[in-house]
């Protein structure tokens, strides 16, 4: 028994774009945001800015940018630096860097509290250097300790003392006694400026 097959020509299915009417088609335009000029302070790289919407402009993304009073005062102030250096400290540079990286950029009083609580042997030595830097700033430059900030904290490798340890069968192992140099720089305002700012 033979079967006869007939080909049926069906129209192609309509495209998806044709199903939607022109009133429902939406092609968003690229949004252009306004450029906001910003400036940073020479002391800590942070400026306080206030952004408020601009109701007078038809652009919904337009806004007013104004620098706060603290940011303006901070830019105009002149800061002085005091340095304390500890050389040939019997400690590897890597062990000192993990503490130095924690206190860099922090206020002086907060740094003292952190060093007293951290459970590392390097904290005791670094605490003495920070105390020395604070004393140099207060006594030599007349800076207020409440305004001091750890602006720079560096650790460099020092001289390495080589020793030997006797081992079995006439051999010897090398012992490396490493040292490092620690530099702490604090930056702050004179005591007179702090008193004038607090009184005003």
From Swiss-Prot:
Record SUPFAM superfamilies: Ribosomal protein L22
UniProt keyword terms in alphabetical order: Chloroplast, Plastid, Ribonucleoprotein, Ribosomal protein, RNA-binding, rRNA-binding, Transit peptide
Gene Ontology cellular-component annotations: chloroplast; large ribosomal subunit
InterPro entries (UniProt xref): Ribosomal_uL22, Ribosomal_uL22_bac/chlpt-type, Ribosomal_uL22_bac/org-type, Ribosomal_uL22_CS, Ribosomal_uL22_sf
PROSITE patterns for the chain: RIBOSOMAL_L22
Location within or outside the cell: Plastid, Chloroplast
Residues making up the signal peptide according to the UniProt record: none
Entry superkingdom: Eukaryota
GO annotation (BP), single: translation
CDD domains listed in its UniProt record: Ribosomal_L22 (cd00336)
One Gene Ontology term of the molecular function aspect: rRNA binding
UniProt subunit comment: Part of the 50S ribosomal subunit.
Family: Belongs to the universal ribosomal protein uL22 family.
NCBIfam families from the UniProt entry: rplV_bact
Note: In legumes L22 is not encoded in the chloroplast but by a nuclear gene.
Entry function: This protein binds specifically to 23S rRNA.
Annotated protein name in UniProt: Large ribosomal subunit protein uL22c
Organism: Medicago sativa (Alfalfa)
Gene: rpl22
